[in-house]
Amino acid sequence: MAKAVGIDLGTTNSVIAVLEGGKPVVLENAEGERVTPSVVAFRDGETLVGRMAKRQAVLNPEGTIFEIKRFIGRRFEEVQEEAKRVPYKVVPGPDGGVRVEVKGKLYTPEEISAMILRKLVEDASKKLGEKITKAVITVPAYFNNAQREATANAGRIAGLEVLRIINEPTAAALAYGLDKKGNETVLVFDLGGGTFDVTILEIGEGVFEVKATSGDTHLGGSDMDHAIVNWLAEEFKKEHGVDLKADRQALQRLIEAAEKAKIELSSTLETTISLPFIALDPASKTPLHLEKKLTRAKFEELIQPLLKRLRGPVEQALKDAGLTPAQIDEVILVGGATRVPAVQQVVRELLGKEPNRSVNPDEVVAMGAAIQAGVLMGEVRDVVLLDVTPLSLGVETKGGVMTVLIPRNTTIPTRKCEIFTTAEHNQTAVEIHVLQGERPMAQDNKSLGRFRLEGIPPMPAGVPQIEVCFDIDANGILHVTAKERSTGREASITIQNTTTLSEEEIQRIIEEAKRHAEEDRRRREHAELKNALDSARVQAERVLQERQGAPEARARLEAAIGKAKELVERDAPDPELKAATEELLKAVEEYEKGAQAASGKGPDDVIDADYKPAD
C-alpha cells in the first residue's frame, strides 16, 4: 500500500512526515534538512524551492516569493499591509484575488504553494523509494473556508489527493498525546511564522476532543521580524536620510538580518546587525553601512504590541471552553516563534504554569498530520528495498565531472570514502552534489540532492582535506557525509531514493551512456584539461606569493598566469589549454630555480599539478 504523508505547509517553513512502524517520522529534503523554507524563486528560466531559493533572495528580491501563506485564499483588498512588507510585486487578479507578478508573469498563491508542496513530496518520495500521492495537510485553526479550500487546491495542483485538511494545533495534540495514558486537558499555543492559534483539547483513551479554539491569522514570527525591520529603517533614515524600504534589495537584506537577530536574541542578550554597503549617500555617492546593536530588552520593547495581541485569543479560548487556567494540565508550545523568551513569559503569566517543551515546535504539527494520514489509510506496510545499488553513485567535482564512489551493482551494505579539496583560495564552504547514473558528466546524471559543508577555515586552494563518505546500509538507504579533517566540521544528507528508477529506466540510462561514450570522453577530457590548467594557475599564484624570484622570471610567470585565466574563462579548445599548461609549469619551474639560487637553499616547494596529457 502506498504511503500517505502529513504536511505542515507553513508561512516561513514547511515539514513533511510519514508514519513508520506506528511512529511519525520527519523526512529530510534533498538538502538533508528536516525543515524546508517556504520560499520559491524564479531565476534565469529556472525555479528554485526551499533553501536554494532563500539563499539567493538578496540578489533576486523581486523574483523570490516568501510568506505566500499570508495571501492564500485572500482577496487583494484584504492584504494591503502584507503586500507593502514584501519586496516582490503583489497585484490584484481578475477575480479580485491575489496574484504575484514576476517578470510579467502572474502566479496565484495556490500555484506558489503547490511548488513548495511538490518539492516536499518529490524529496520525500525519493527518500521513501516510492511515489507519494496522498496527504493530510494542516492549516491554522483560524483559517476560513476560502483559505482551507485554497490550501486543498494547492495540494491538488501539486498532484496530491488531499485526504483531509486538519487544524495545526489538533495535529500537534495528536503527536503529543499518541502514547499518553489517562485523561488530560491540554492547551496548544501555536505561534508560527505568520499565524497564531490557541486550541484547548481533552485527550483520553485515544480520543482527541477539541473544546475551543481561537487565534489571529495576521500574527506570527515574521511580524516580529518586520518590527525590527521598521526600527532599523527608521534609525537609518534619521541618520542618513535614506529610506531603505524603498530599495527592494536593501529591504530583503533587512528582512534576513532581522530574522537572524530575532533567533540570536532567543539565546543571547545582545546582538549586532551589520549590513555593509546597504545604500549610497545621496549627496556624495559614497557607500553607507548599517551597524546597529540590538539588545533583548529593546527587541521586547519593539514587539510589545505583538505580545499584547497574544493575550486575547488565549483568554477567549479559555472562556469558550468554560475553563480557568488552573484547569489546564499542560501547555504545549508549537511554532518557531515560541522560542522567543518574551513569548514564553506571556504564557507563564496567562496560564500560571511552565510550558511543556517535550515536543519539537517546528516538527510536531507535521508529525500529527502523519498520524492522521496513517489512521485514514489503515495499516502501513514496510518499504521493500533492493539489496544492490542499481546505478553508480558519486558526486559532482570541478568541471562538472561525476566522480563515482560506489559503482552500480555493488552489494550492500557498503561504505566508500574519498578525499576532495577546495578549488579556490579561502573557500569557506563547499556544496556536495550527490549523483546517480553512468555518464561521465554530472549534468547527464540524476541529481539525488545537494547539501553544504560550511565553516571550512580560510586556506589556499587545494589545502583543505574534505572526506566525503557514501554509506549504503542493509535497507538500501544512502547516507552521505562530508567532513573537513582539520576542524572535524561535518554535514550530511540521507537519501532513500537510490532504487526508485524502474528497470526499464535503468537499462535506458546504461544504453544511453554507451551511445554517448565518445562524446562523453571528449567532454570529460576537455574538463580535465581545464582543471589541470586552473590547478596549475592556483599553485603558480601561491609560488608568486611565497617566493622571491628574478623580475624577468616573475613577469613571465605573471603573463602565463594571466593567459591561463583568460583561456579557462573563454573555454578555449583543448590544444590551447594543453599548451598553456605546459608553458605555465615551465614558467613556474624557471621561477623556482631563480628563487632557490637567490636564496642559496634547496627546493622546499613542490608543485603538484593535477595534469595528465591527453592520449
Curated annotation (Swiss-Prot):
Q: Where is this region: Disordered?
A: 592-615
Q: What is this protein called?
A: Chaperone protein DnaK
- Return the InterPro entries for the record: ATPase_NBD (IPR043129), Chaperone_DnaK (IPR012725), Heat_shock_70_CS (IPR018181), HSP70_peptide-bd_sf (IPR029047), Hsp_70_fam (IPR013126)
Family recorded in the similarity comment: Belongs to the heat shock protein 70 family.
Checking CDD domains in the record gives: ASKHA_NBD_HSP70_DnaK-like
Quote the SUPFAM superfamilies the UniProt record gives.
Actin-like ATPase domain, Heat shock protein 70kD (HSP70), peptide-binding domain
Record text on subunit structure and interactions: Forms a heterononamer with DnaJ and DafA in the resting state. Three copies of each protein are present in the complex.
Induction of expression: By stress conditions e.g. heat shock.
- Any other noteworthy remark? In the resting state, the DnaK-DnaJ-DafA complex cannot bind substrate. As the substrate becomes sufficiently high, DafA is displaced and an active DnaK-substrate-DnaJ complex is formed.
Q: Name one GO molecular function term.
A: ATP binding
Q: What does this protein do?
A: Cooperates with DnaJ, GrpE and ClpB to reactivate heat-inactivated proteins.
**Is Chaperone set as a keyword in this record?**
yes
- Coiled coil spans: none
The record's section on Gene3D superfamilies has: 3.30.420.40, Actin, Chain A, domain 4, Substrate Binding Domain Of DNAk, Chain A, domain 1
Q: Name one Pfam family in it.
A: HSP70
Modification Phosphothreonine occurs at? T195
Q: Does the keyword rRNA-binding apply?
A: no
Gene that produces this protein:
dnaK
